[in-house]
Amino acid sequence: MSIFTKIKKSLKSENLVNYNKFIKNLEFDEKNSTSTHLIIKAPNIFIANFVKRKYLNKISELYEKETGIKPKIDIVTKEISHRPLTIEEIIEPTTPSVLIPEYTFESFIVGPSNQFAYTAAKSVAENPGKNYNPLFIYGGVGLGKTHLLQAIGNYLKSSLNVLYVTSEQFMNEFTENIRMKTPERFHEKYRNCDVLLIDDVQFFAGKERTQEEFFHTFNELYNQKKQICLTADRPPKKLYDLVDRLRSRFEAGLIVDIQPPELETKIEIIRKKCELNGIYLPEEIIEYIATKLDSNIREIEGMITKINAMSKILGISEITLDFAKQALKEHIKDKKEVITLEDIIKLIAKEFNIKPSEIVSKSRNKNIVAARRCAIYLAREFTKESTPIIAKYFGLRDHSAVSHAIKSFNKKLKEDSEFRIKIEELKNKIQIKKSE
């Protein structure tokens, strides 16, 4: 096995998705390389740039570990490794449609938490542009949104012109074409596809020119009855920094969510991942992983890989529960719960005996106003959201209204000792949730 093959194998064990997207098709240029100067060929400029940014140091470290030599590394494109890039070559590969073959409907584990999203995605794939257009899938990180989006693409790619990109890729390519004064090239690519799949549209937030361009792209495709599928980490109504007319387009189709998988679904996911990767884990270890680890499927995959890799490195032929606990000890110990605005709203609604929807309403009822101010105060203290985002979430005019609410709340804290004790109890509950 060559050194470069070993390096690729090591990178594959760390992140299978990125390996399939960016590392798998890299080639080592033996003819032009030396022991101190490595030339690696990438299929296109996009992959070359990604590998330079994300993997150059790692490849260098792995090579030095194998040989004892710290190399100089050049990442070039296969077809243009010995000549300058033309404008066309720079622009065209900037946003490749990378569909991962493994992401199919057959490999997607269905459970109560994702049944509706799965059924909707399958229906769209079977009747593109007819049933649900656009299809908007939202949910937390690592729950399967990208898998379903790509499953649609893989189902249709043999018969239709399918274009899959992330919102960041869309934005980067749009910006590059504007800079190069070639907007027609961008329009030709994005407005002539049959199926447009865009991942993580929440990253369009605040990018006004990109939103404007996507609005026109959306309309052009929609009017031609072309299928549009989108994913985000939240529903359209909570994409606060999107222009209203774009948000309304998203809301006009079918909106489905994916919830964190319940225990039984997590167990099935772990079994499937082990089967696909040729890894055997006893049932008690599978159940341990399912109960102890986050519902983030990517994290679960990473832990399976870690247990398997550690067992091979240490020469352990039979993986026991004690070994699995030891392998995952640091990860489980360091896990922290992320507190969201929704968590704050639910907690305050329960404490004040009102509905969550009343907290974000315009009601001036004294009890609801007090609950709202309390929620705003705790949101500012315990979530990562900015003041403008908090303002929009609670339906306030702007960030100054948040400051006013917090000021009023602090005044009550100083004046009312009983109220202060109650708030400290709420803070303790949130701290406990964070450390779980």
Swiss-Prot record:
Region (Domain IV, binds dsDNA): 312-436
Region: Domain I, interacts with DnaA modulators, residue numbers: 1-69
Region feature (Domain II): 69-97
UniProt KW Magnesium keyword: no
Key words, A-Z: ATP-binding, Cytoplasm, DNA replication, DNA-binding, Lipid-binding, Nucleotide-binding
SS bonds (residue pairs): none
GO biological process: DNA replication initiation; regulation of DNA replication
Pfam name, any one: Bac_DnaA_C
GO cellular component: cytoplasm; plasma membrane
Record InterPro entries: AAA+_ATPase, Chromosome_initiator_DnaA, Chromosome_initiator_DnaA-like, DnaA_C, DnaA_dom, DnaA_N_dom, DnaA_N_sf, P-loop_NTPase
Region annotated Domain III, AAA+ region, chain positions: 98-311
Stored CDD domains: AAA, Bac_DnaA_C
Entry's Gene Ontology molecular function annotations: ATP binding; ATP hydrolysis activity; DNA replication origin binding; lipid binding
Main location: cytoplasm
Superkingdom, taxonomy of origin: Bacteria
Residues involved in ATP binding: G142, G144, K145, T146
The keyword Zinc is annotated on this UniProt entry: no
Subcellular location(s) of the protein: Cytoplasm
Function of the protein: Plays an essential role in the initiation and regulation of chromosomal replication. ATP-DnaA binds to the origin of replication (oriC) to initiate formation of the DNA replication initiation complex once per cell cycle. Binds the DnaA box (a 9 base pair repeat at the origin) and separates the double-stranded (ds)DNA. Forms a right-handed helical filament on oriC DNA; dsDNA binds to the exterior of the filament while single-stranded (ss)DNA is stabiized in the filament's interior.
Free-text domain note: Domain I is involved in oligomerization and binding regulators, domain II is flexibile and of varying length in different bacteria, domain III forms the AAA+ region, while domain IV binds dsDNA.
Subunit details: Oligomerizes as a right-handed, spiral filament on DNA at oriC.
Similarity remark: Belongs to the DnaA family.
Name recorded for this polypeptide: Chromosomal replication initiator protein DnaA
Organism from which the protein derives: Nautilia profundicola (strain ATCC BAA-1463 / DSM 18972 / AmH)
Gene: dnaA
